Amino acid sequence: MQEVVTGKRAELLSAEFLKKNNLTIICKNYRIDGGEVDIIARDGHYWVFCEVKFRDDESFAAVIEQIQPQQCRRIRYTARHYLLSNNIDEHTAAIRFDVIAIVGQPTKIEWFKDAF
């Protein structure tokens, strides 16, 4: 149960961080069969699909390394579904896949734009 609470807190911190950096949050926890995107946002003309990762005691690099190719495929699949469901042409839309890494206590946030 603690992991779920921590994950939700990390997603809230990430959304606030993105807002402070002038992104518009469109959707949180977009789920379909076979995938989920933690945060969907707009950064100017970009559609940004964010994966949020939290670890108590690891470096930012270690957190990024934990994102496996299969997870990237699922996020891309889910992003494509979102775009198609909202009549957004995936071939002409500006799309970016970012990672927000939150590490340590007290927490530090690192934003990896165009991470995969």
Curated annotation (Swiss-Prot):
It comes from the Bacteria. GO terms for molecular function: nucleic acid binding. InterPro entries: Restrct_endonuc-II-like, tRNA_endonuc-like_dom_sf, UPF0102_YraN-like. Belongs to the UPF0102 family. This is UPF0102 protein IL0423.
